[in-house]
Amino acid sequence: MTAITDIIAREILDSRGNPTVEVDVYLEDGSMGRAAVPSGASTGAHEAVELRDGGKRYLGKGVEKAVEAANTEIFDAIGGIDAENQIQIDNIMIELDGTPNKSRLGANAILGVSLAVAKAAAQASGLPLYRYVGGASASLLPVPMMNIINGGAHADNPIDFQEFMILPVGADTIAEAVRMGSEVFHTLRKELAAQGHNTNVGDEGGFAPGLKSASEALDFIVKSVEKAGYKPGEDIYLGLDCASTEFFKDGKYVLEGEGRTLESGAMAEYLAELAAKYPIISIEDGMAEDDWDGWKALTDLAGKKIQLVGDDLFVTNSARLRDGIRMGVANSILVKVNQIGSLTETLDAVNTAHKAAYTAVMSHRSGETEDSTIADLAVATNCGQIKTGSLSRSDRLAKYNQLIRIEEGLGPQAQYAGRSIIRG
């Protein structure tokens, strides 16, 4: 009754107005699952390939080739197979593609089908997606890492680092965490405006003021947390996503906004100093994706005190994660479904991290849609943390709203991760 009977893929637009792939998978019993694929602005060199058409249409960013692959070649390969056989279906698509980075069919085609299959199977089973994927133990609501100041590739301003986040660990529920985040977000808007800064928002819904340094951004956030009635370092902690690969040039870190250039060791020391000065408990991509020595230096300096998240470093790839674990590099992995391109491989990356006592953070991309699948996956995997942007833009809020619904559905079984995510 759960055999796949049809796949209908289409080209839709993401939150940046760029094309992306959406897939509907239909089953024999009438069940249907729909998934839309996100897209990143700052992408790791080792990510699975997002297939684009080239040419004049959509300035080369069309996805008709990926849509065609899903509708024809992929459907021909998996049509008739039970949707409950997720691993088999994903492996068939990976083998059908035949490349190490999914560049022939496109990770956007494969992922769209993979997620839609899981959602169709969940509907057929009468279970919410988080329960279908995660089983009876899926009950941990993640701490949101809310990106309220944007810089780097996500905004048109001088700030070198890409994201400045708040983590409301002092909340008792995800609903309360969202409220706390919203209050700080709106307080920050007033603080920025009062100082003459613009309050335009970036790709992920955070403000993109013309600040020149990380310290200036962090000072604004700390002040806003306090003015909103919360205690920095108790109710709310801070997090950074440096996206350091974006400003790593000729073996050095070029902080143009701050007017300085740092060697790897000095960059690690700078980040450790920021973490000591401010209530920072998480730094993502503090070093560049292939600067393994720099990552080791940063881990040795700060790895026992704070969470060091590998995004471009690991690209949700279990093989690269195992390399990092073996080398004692970082202590956490950022999990982006489109970096690896299938649900099975995504879950494998989370399991690999947890077995090595690394944390895992479920994450959106800067180019998103109204699809809220990652909210369910964060609960399904008991990650305990989720990155899905700021407290504005419907493409970001869709995930927060879904987490609130999941918490409501879990009732007394629901647990909010809260302070359990803090290291040291």
UniProtKB/Swiss-Prot annotation:
Organismal lineage: Bacteria, Pseudomonadati, Pseudomonadota, Alphaproteobacteria, Hyphomicrobiales
Binding site for Mg(2+): D241, E284, D311
Family: Belongs to the enolase family.
Catalytic residues of the enzyme: E204, K336
Cross-referenced HAMAP family: Enolase
NCBIfam families: eno (TIGR01060)
EC number: 4.2.1.11
One BP term from GO: glycolytic process
Annotated PROSITE patterns: ENOLASE
Described function: Catalyzes the reversible conversion of 2-phosphoglycerate (2-PG) into phosphoenolpyruvate (PEP). It is essential for the degradation of carbohydrates via glycolysis.
Cellular compartment(s): Cytoplasm; Secreted; Cell surface
Gene Ontology CC: cell surface; extracellular region; phosphopyruvate hydratase complex
CDD domains reported for this sequence: enolase
Keyword set includes Transmembrane: no
Details of cofactor binding: Binds a second Mg(2+) ion via substrate during catalysis.
Cofactor: Mg(2+)
Chain residues that bind (2R)-2-phosphoglycerate: Q162, K336, R365, S366, K387
Name this protein carries in UniProt: Enolase
Name of one Pfam family that matches: Enolase_N
Substrates-to-products reaction catalysed: (2R)-2-phosphoglycerate = phosphoenolpyruvate + H2O
GO molecular function: magnesium ion binding; phosphopyruvate hydratase activity
Pathway(s) of this molecule: Carbohydrate degradation; glycolysis; pyruvate from D-glyceraldehyde 3-phosphate: step 4/5
Superkingdom of origin organism: Bacteria
Keyword terms: Cytoplasm, Glycolysis, Lyase, Magnesium, Metal-binding, Secreted
